[in-house]
Structures are given as structure tokens and as C-alpha cells.
């Protein structure tokens, strides 16, 4: 493959951002599926959130097929649906598993070791144990004994720094893969002769399939509605425990790059109408995901205050 220089234009910018968006959406479900598997629990996720997202992806798939979108988009829509089913399966499986019985002796108020943690054990807002009865990895590290009274803050900052570096590395890798996959295609197409167009043939017009648009708007409404139960669950628990930060980070990045890839091509009204349902869904869910992002940081500070 011959490397070729980039020509920055609307098509190039749209292609790069679109490819990055696809990379984000391919990986988006993996962090949450792993989080559920690691904790052997999905109690941090709202079941209604997963069900509505699955319904939205089903309508998105139907709309993509009816609107005759690119085969890549149809394959991705089908992939999203399968990933949703896996996520839903985890929720149903772990919810039906037997929870470990609580030992009333070890949690007795008469036991001085548990005097300060009895309330927290029964409080969903500050879980000390995961579903297997094992201490959470971060809580374990922050609880490390030290003669320094500020050791808890130092450990917390150290854990947060490691997690931040890890997240930056993962996100950068996904963005890089998205760019490289686009650039390889760009180089291959660059070396091929352009297709010969017959000037006598009329330029094909954009055809709007209104049934596909209806499915697209239904999908957008379901995507928007899916975030509400999750936001309310986080607010009720005063915690984002059990939710993968990368899950929503990749969703935000995927939506942002998708929106840019669409509007950078053209602002023609007919073109925007054809893509309006997908744009509405992406913009709306992006706003809702920012709300969940704010909950991550708000409840993270609350947890630090409680630990101190």
C-alpha cells in the first residue's frame, strides 16, 4: 500500500470523524459487559435503560435497512442489537442469581469491628462488598493502613490517576484505530482510478423514505427515554457504582463524531431532513449522557467525603 498525503476537505473530515465514531460504537458495550462480568452483578444498570436502548437499536436497524444506508451502517446496527441482547442477558442472569446471605452475627452491632460499617453494609448508596462478598478493588486500595492521616486522600488520588491514565490510553487507542482504518481505505481508493461518470445520465436525487424516517424518530425517542431511568436510578442511589465510565464516554464520543461527520458534508435542507432523526437522537442522547457524566463526578466527590 502506498502512503498518500491527506487532502483536507469536507469529505475527508467526514470520513475521519465517521470512522472514529464507528470505532467508538464497536467498543462502547465492551467496558460495561466486562464491568458486569467482573462484579458478577448488574445492579448499577437500570433494566429499563437497557430494554429501551435495545428497542431503539431495533428500530434503528429497521430504519437503516429501509432507508438503504451503507452496508457498514446496517451491519453496525445489527451488532448494536446483539450487544444489547448480551447486556440484557447479563441483567436478567445476575438479578436471578442467589445473593449471599447476610450473617447476622458478623454484622451484629455488638461486634465493635463492624460498629462503623453496619449502616453502610445495608445502605445501597455505599456498597462495601460486591455481589460475591469481596471488597471492591478501589475501596480495598483506599483502605490501606498507614500512619499518615492523609494516606486515604493520597491513595484515592493515586487510584484516580491510574484510572485516568488507563482511560486516556484506551480512548486514544480507539481513536487511533478509527483514524488508521479510514486512512487505509483512503490510500487504497486514492491509487484506484476514479469511476467514469456518464454525463448523459441524470444526477440521482436524494429519496426520503418516510417509513424509515418514522422508525428513525422512534429510535431517537427510545434512545432519549432510555437515559431517564438510569439518571433516576443514579440519583436514588446517590452513586454510579456498577456503571462503566468508559461506557458513556465512548457513547458521547461516538455521538459527537457522528454528528460532525453528518453536518460537515452538507447543510442542504433535504440532506438534513433525511438525517434529521439520527441527528436528533445523537444530539439528545449526547445531552443526557452529559447529565450522567455530571453524576459520576458529583457522586464521586460524595463518596470521597463519606470515606474521609
UniProtKB/Swiss-Prot annotation:
Cytoplasmic side stretches: 34-44, 90-167, 227-244, 299-308
An example Gene Ontology CC term for this record: endoplasmic reticulum
InterPro entries: LAAT-1 (IPR051415), PQ-loop_rpt (IPR006603)
Bilayer topology annotation: Multi-pass membrane protein
Primary localisation category: membrane
Vacuolar side: 1-12, 66-68, 189-205, 266-277
Pfam families the record matches: PQ-loop
Any Gene Ontology biological process: L-lysine transmembrane import into vacuole
Family: Belongs to the laat-1 family.
Protein name (record): Vacuolar lysine transporter YPQ1
Organism: Saccharomyces cerevisiae (strain ATCC 204508 / S288c)
